[in-house]
Amino acid sequence: MRQMDKSAIIDTLQEQGGFITTGEVKSRGEYEQLRRAAEAGTVMRLRKGIYAECSALANNMIDVERIVPHGILCLYSAFAYYGLSTQVPSATCVAIEAKRKVRLPDYPPIDLYYWKKENLEFGIISRNISGYDVRITDIERTVCDAVKYRNKIGLDVCGEVIDSYLKKEDRNISLLHEYALSLIHI
């Protein structure tokens, strides 16, 4: 019976893309199955109310919206997504509003960047990455962020991002200029 319980909760997790919240659990019995699966190590508790199937965590992309609601992939994670840098991010880079407080799980590693609300209102798009709907800075905004945070990320990374962007055929220099002006005034 216990093996069947574990299998049922794993099936539910797989249907949900590897992640589940206690709010999505339909009954006390399912909650107990989830708790037992976490105790057995089949499922990992990321933080209070959020669980993930261990194999889902092996993927290099995470369901950012579940772990950091309203978070936006940025900087190194965006550089990697757009192929602007050869740097491999050691953690998922997520921007949130400066006044927010977020409790992060031990795993997966996430670096939070606290941005002013005005910074979160432009240059943000939604993409389906590895099966997850993720909000991410668009490519022009990503390049502007590289320049803005050049002292934090390093001039070598900033230069690599700019060079890679300028080699792209689909670049939009006028949008890049518009974003640069917006970031100057924030």
Features from the language model and the residues they span:
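Short beta-edge/loop segments at beta->alpha junctions of small alpha/beta modules
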Residues: 1-73
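Extended, low-hydrophobicity, polar/charged segments
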Residues: 38, 56, 66-69, 101, ...
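Short, charged/polar surface micro-motifs in flexible loops or helix N-caps
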Residues: 57-59, 70-71, 85, 99-101, ...
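Ordered, amphipathic secondary-structure segments that act as subunit-interaction surfaces
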Residues: 75-98, 102
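Short, structured loop/turn "capping" segments at alpha-beta junctions
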Residues: 86-89, 153-155, 171-172
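Conserved, surface-exposed functional patches that form binding/active-site neighborhoods
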Residues: 92-162
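Conserved small/polar residues in nucleotide/adenosyl-binding loops
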Residues: 184-186
